[in-house]
Amino acid sequence: MAGSLTASNRRRNAEDSSEIYRWTIGFARFVHYPSSPSPHPVLKPLGKREQYHSPHGTWLSASSSTVSLHIVDELNRSDVILSVKLGQKVLEEHYISKLNFTWPQMSCVSGFPSRGSRAIFVTYMDSANQIQKFALRFSTCDAALEFVEALKEKIKGLKEASTQNQKNKTRCDVSFQSDYNPSDAIIPRATQKEPNMVRPLNSYVPEMLPRIVYEAQYQKSETRSEVSFQSDYNPSIEIFPRATEEEPNMVRFFDSSVPEVLPRPEYEAGQALYPSQSTLNQIPSLPPSFTTLLSGCFPDSTLDAGQTTVKQNPDLKSQILKYMEDSSFQDMLQKVERIIDEIGGNWIT
């Protein structure tokens, strides 16, 4: 039969393991007219009315106390089977998920709610994409209502089971994805990144910490406005060996005018070294007032190779000692030492 179940051989097992709903009904089936006349001489050909007017078919009914309607769950409860039997002969057998049900409503008295009729129409599409129809007529309206309620309950159970199966499938997929660890895959060595790779010394770019940069810029601007003296400054000597090799985050100031001074014990001993006049002329970063002060305090030194010492003026010594004993110079010196300590004071030793 077109549209019948392909799992008819499992019907008996399903009936043994599931709850069965049963009703005594009247049954009718719609039979389509053939598309072409039959060549058999016994069959009477169709007239023009049947060929060219609706419904292009006829209803065949069976009204007997032996016709029964059954609703039974599938063995694995994936669907529900609806079957119509004439005695032990199966007339219709379908999954309810493949069927469309129509229940006409009627009202005998105006003002009262409508009630469903005793007849229910069922349609489905067969393998040839042709719509097939049959009708179920119950003995009472209450019996029809009971069938509809049972049908709704079964359909609701199918929807809940489908939703639960979908959730279980989703959980299974999520569990599989969580168990999968892409880091276990073998990555070619050429594609691996080695951020800790030692780079050549000449290609190293020091990294400045935000806090040190901010404090150093603030101290640099404050020191430029207060510094008025510099001792033993030689820009040709770069004293940054440890900052280059051991402390990559050490901050360097190549364009800063912060003076570099000797350790405090040398000032207390009164020892001071002074650069030559030619060296002072090569320092463009010093303030004009500071350069003028040093140029006026030191005598010109000769450029002869044999003459390496500069004669010291006693008045100049007393003037330097006077500057060293001044409170403003001591405050400036303490600020410079504090800056050196904050950016790493051990590199000057």
UniProtKB/Swiss-Prot annotation:
Changing residue 203 to N: No effect on meiosis. Disruption phenotype: Sterility. Chromosome paring defects during meiosis. GO terms for cellular component: cytoplasm. The keyword Membrane does not apply. One of its GO terms (biological process) is homologous chromosome pairing at meiosis. It is found in: Cytoplasm. Required for accurate chromosome segregation in meiosis. Required for pairing to occur between homologous chromosomes. Acts in early recombination steps and ensures pairing fidelity and proper repair of meiotic DNA double-strand-breaks. Regulates recombination and pairing of homologous chromosomes during meiotic prophase by controlling transport of RAD50 from cytoplasm to the nucleus. May affect pairing of the gene-rich fraction of the genome rather than preventing pairing between repetitive DNA elements. This is Protein POOR HOMOLOGOUS SYNAPSIS 1. The lineage of its organism: Eukaryota, Viridiplantae, Streptophyta, Embryophyta, Tracheophyta. The gene is PHS1.
